[in-house]
Amino acid sequence: MTALMTLNGVRIEYQDIGTSSAGKPALVLLTGWGHDLRYYRRLIPHLAPEFRVVALSWRGHDADRTLVGDYGVHEQTADTIALLDAIGVDVFVPVAHAHGGWVALQLADELGVQRVPRVLIADLIMTTIPSDFAAAVRDLQKPDRWKSARAGLAKSWLSGGVTLPLLKHLLIESRGFGFDTWARSGRVIEDAYNRWGSPMGRMEQLNEPRPIRHVFSHPKTSSYDELHVAFRGRHPWFSHRRLAGRTHFPAHELPREIATEIRAFVNEST
């Protein structure tokens, strides 16, 4: 059941389900932009028997799509910490989809390895920002281009792997986000790549190394796998898994497989 809490002056919707087995951390599920916590509705049932699972919707991403002031990774991080403190979550592993990964890494940096011992990210572009994606996130910030940019991104994210549950999520559960949210997403994403170079560059700047895993289906190129192998060669705390999915939405498309990856990764330390 979805609950609501006002934190830092904004509405935050969340679900808090299950109880972690002895010695296991909670799992905190973070979405990308333009999704609310229902993105994880197919994954949570596979995790809740073993873990306490907290899923939240970012500010401005509640069911009413409440308009709020400007915000970015800093505010998303602060809201997440405030929620976890309020509901008594101490040690946890962030599980982040796409550009929610920037928040997961910021949480790790701010809270330290004792509270955030591991991070799992799904389907985030690990290279420097590709030119076509850079053009798309710039177009998201233009009133006359944002809808076409969003449509183009959605087409690439689906890659022909349309299913009824995924269509329901994209067309019904994810509707209602207007130019305000999509333009902000473009700016925040662009700013993150400009600041850090890439998510891997951000990982290298963490104050304390800890195990980080990236699981992904896109893009389907050998050079992308080689990038991950090379990064692990420099940083043994990093690992990756390529998934057999077709879309950019693994928690929706492959919930059982993602749950297996999460359990294996978290249980390495327990």
From Swiss-Prot:
Site (Increases basicity of active site His): D123
Keywords linked to the UniProt accession: Dioxygenase, Oxidoreductase, Plasmid
Catalytic activity of the protein: 2-heptyl-3-hydroxy-4(1H)-quinolone + O2 = N-octanoylanthranilate + CO + H(+)
Broad EC category: oxidoreductase
Residues the record lists as binding substrate: H99
Annotated active site: H248 (proton donor/acceptor)
E.C. code: 1.13.11.-
Residue ranges of every copy of the AB hydrolase-1 domain listed in the record: 25-156
KW Oxidoreductase (keyword) present: yes
Regulation: induction: Up-regulated by PQS.
One of the record's GO molecular function terms: dioxygenase activity
Family statement: Belongs to the AB hydrolase superfamily.
PANTHER family linked to this entry: EPOXIDE HYDROLASE
Function: Involved in the degradation of the Pseudomonas aeruginosa quorum sensing signal molecules HHQ (2-heptyl-4-quinolone) and PQS (2-heptyl-3-hydroxy-4-quinolone) to anthranilic acid. Catalyzes the cleavage of PQS to form N-octanoylanthranilic acid and carbon monoxide.
Protein name: 2-heptyl-3-hydroxy-4-quinolone dioxygenase AqdC2
Lineage: Bacteria, Bacillati, Actinomycetota, Actinomycetes, Mycobacteriales
